[in-house]
């Protein structure tokens, strides 16, 4: 039996008392005097009321405990939701920062690749210049030997100074060639050093990209775990809300039963469960006080009245009170 049926049966206790009195054996009523029968019936009714009252108090204590548990669960769920929201915001920020770092690393890699290509082009140009310079030197040496032969064979160059002036003219060009060669060597060494540095930087950035990718995967995994926890908390909250709705419906049915019998005020809102329980408790206490007063008055009146012998009209039926 659920709580609603229990309180409906409790509110119909007058009918149950009458049925109980009607089921009493006729021979036992004939043997006992009327005051004793009334006293026994009153004691039975008081026992029934005490049992009903104890059951009601136990039911109310259970409802109060469930209500406290539900409030504690609701507070825990709210705290968990706040923590979950904060963790989501924190993970989103971490993810955005990781994306920014990865984009920055990619842009730097692209920039370094462009610089490396430019240096390679410069090195190629310098190699071409060096080859051209070497070719010119070889060409001038051949020309010098050829000119000596020409001086010997030709009539145009008759003296050695003319030949030396021509030689010095050729030698004056050699320092420039050496400087260019030295610059070419320096640029080559710089290129090699720069390529080594850039390769190390590329390796470092590749490792950084890999590490950021691992962090991104961990963040995605943690986000999925929190989504699963969120779904579980939603299911728990839904189940608790259904249980709370069942309890509220039972209390509302009891309150409507009390109101329909004219034992309480109808000014309480439908959602004010605590106030409805308080009105039910007060009505039960009022009915109990009335019953005790009537019982006390009846006990005071019994010694004054003379004992009545059972008649045909009273046999099998309880006296009206």
Curated annotation (Swiss-Prot):
Record bears the keyword Coiled coil: yes
Gene Ontology cellular component annotations, sorted alphabetically: cytoskeleton
Domain of life according to the entry: Eukaryota
Coiled coil region boundaries: 36-144, 202-229
Keyword Coiled coil (UniProt): yes
A Pfam family it matches: DUF4200
Xref: InterPro entries: CFAP_domain-containing, DUF4200
Keywords (A to Z) from UniProt: Coiled coil
Similarity-based family: Belongs to the CFAP73 family.
PANTHER family listed in its UniProt record: COILED-COIL DOMAIN-CONTAINING PROTEIN 42 LIKE-2-LIKE-RELATED, COILED-COIL DOMAIN-CONTAINING PROTEIN 42-LIKE 1
Protein name, entry field: Coiled-coil domain-containing protein 42-like 1
Species name: Xenopus laevis
